[in-house]
Amino acid sequence: MNELILLSFSHIFIVFICIASIIFIPKFFKHSSAATHSSLAYFIISLILINQGMDLYREGYLDEWKLGLPLHLCDFSSFSILIYLLTKKRDFFIFAFFFGIAGAGMSILTPDTGYGFPAVAYIQNQIGHTAIILGVTYAMVIDNQRPYLKDVARA
């Protein structure tokens, strides 16, 4: 396995792919049909669920449970955006927006893994955190959700 080097070509390339996905996937689907929007939402939901399942398996079965505890804010943001995509309730978008973007963005740039690409933990980290921000971007671009200053107190 390769040690994680933040300025390595592979890490910068993966970060570029993550950021491009976050920006361009919702823009590409913006003017599509409602059925296509729904399919994209279910794709994001699937990414989040598979990532959380892999995380549970890796930390709960292969490693020790205590390595997965306490739950990180990104775990709550994952489930928040997942619930938003299923129900379209604004409160879940607000939580994912204010607590998900900063944490997930930092984790994409500086992952909490000892190894870089192609380690499974690294790939899982990048996909999971990209899915959080992709879900928030979906809500903003396709569902026209917007955070307002008054929403800070609600988060």
Please identify what each model-predicted range represents.
Residues F9-V15, L62-C74, I94-F97:
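Structural signature of hydrophobic alpha-helical transmembrane segments
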Residues I45-L56, G100-D112:
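Aromatic-anchored segments of alpha-helical transmembrane domains
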Residues M1-I19:
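Hydrophobic transmembrane alpha-helical segments in integral membrane proteins
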Residues Y57-W65, T87-R90, P111-I123:
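Membrane-interface helix caps and helix-loop-helix hairpins in membrane proteins
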Residues I44, F95-A104, D151-A155:
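Central hydrophobic cores of alpha-helical transmembrane segments
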Residues P26-S39, L86-F92, I142-A153:
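Membrane-interface helix-boundary motifs at transmembrane edges
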Residues A20-I25, I81, A131-L149:
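Alpha-helical transmembrane segments in multipass membrane proteins, preferentially the mid-helix core
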Residues T36-A41, L69, F93-I101, Y122-Q126:
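Cytoplasmic-side transmembrane-helix entry/capping segments in multi-pass membrane proteins
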